[in-house]
Structures are given as structure tokens and as C-alpha cells.
Amino acid sequence: MADLYTIWANKEGDISDIDFVNNMKSFLQHLVDEDKMISYRITRCKMGFRSVADMPEWLIIMEFKNMAQIDEAFRRVAPLEGELEDKHRSFNQFVAGDIQHALWRDYPDTF
């Protein structure tokens, strides 16, 4: 079982799609390399196909072992300093204000 932290976002500002994604990958891979996250995927709505008209174009899925690992990742990012923050800022400043977040878990839980 895993916890999936999902983000739906649109990109705005002066950055190419490739740079936006590559910068995001650098940040997320840093968390994977530090064992703060299991894996991630960055996806984009294909040809604008979606049933919800205002659903953001980008979907980022981050997989964690459990809530404790999510907490470790947030604690790692929260100081907003150093190389990791530079990587975070390199794409996050181009995320539009309509960002949405959700936390999912396999069901049923084993609790």
C-alpha cells in the first residue's frame, strides 16, 4: 500500500514546457534520492482531452510509503533554503494559482 499525493496545476509565465518539467524532475528526483519519496510521475493532459473544463493541464503524482514519509518530505522542503529550495523555486514560481492537491490511498486500508 502507498499514499499518493497528487497535484493538478497549470503553468504560467516565461518558461518552456520542457524546462518546467525538467526543473520539476530535478526537484522530485532529489527527494527520491534522499529516500523521502518512493517515486513520481509528471503527466500532461493529452490533446486537451478532459471532461472537466477547468481541470489543470498537468498532473503530478508522488508516491510515498506512508504518512510518515510524506511528513519527512515536507519537513525536508519546509526550510525553504539551500539547493533543494533552488530546485523547488525553479519550477514552482511558474505554477498558476488554480493549483489543486489531493492525497489518495489504496482502498481498503489494512488498518
Feature-to-residue mapping (PLM):
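C-terminal structural segments of small proteins and small subunits
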Residues: L84-F91
